[in-house]
């Protein structure tokens, strides 16, 4: 994604709309400056191992600090996607999502990977904003537990293997994540880092609250049943045979998760059960909002 927080107007004028301003925060000028530096130094040899240095901490902080600063100046309703750096955490305040006008999100892959994985996985984990340092990964989890970060997402982007198996500059950014996102969080639960209540709150309750989604995000009578049922005692090894994406690959290929997904329900319909996808898909519906 390209950051569009380049003008005060987009946030200033948001008060004339009932919608929340949502931003992917990377400063494009900083990224382009870094791209030029690495191109001059490495030429055709620039690789995914340089990605977090090109789309670096400063590019994220400059953009997110601008967005948050403008939101405070104009009392705007702002939600920042895909936080990736420890430095950005000071921009956000702890508290209940219902009491905030400035909220934030973290993605599951930024809670799992760090810069050491680039040497093995390369373009498979090339994504924007980039996966950064271990200190950033642990800071994101800490901020989540402190309620500075309100929502957990996947930023699922299932590019084909042929697209990703290209040179660094030609390979698209993004990775498939929705199949294993919950298992990443269950691994953190198994490590006593996060509790189940927090997982449910950040992946479901707070999403519905923040965006005022009608009749979703909770297990309640009259609500749509969008539910994942897990076996937290049944390990699961990712392989090409059990990857369900049409793109056919996952950066977690070969990884052993501590839990398994037994069943998923979409709008009250069983979409997946015990390794089998339902024949009569899709069950999707257009969501509605209470605004």
What does each of the following model-derived ranges do?
Residues 77, 81-183, 187:
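Active-site neighborhoods of metal-dependent hydrolases
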Residues 23-37:
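Short, solvent-exposed beta-strand-terminating loops
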Residues 45-75, 124, 145-152, 157-232:
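His/Asp/Glu-enriched, well-ordered alpha-helical/loop segment
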Residues 167-170, 221-287:
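C-terminal cap of metal-dependent C-N hydrolases
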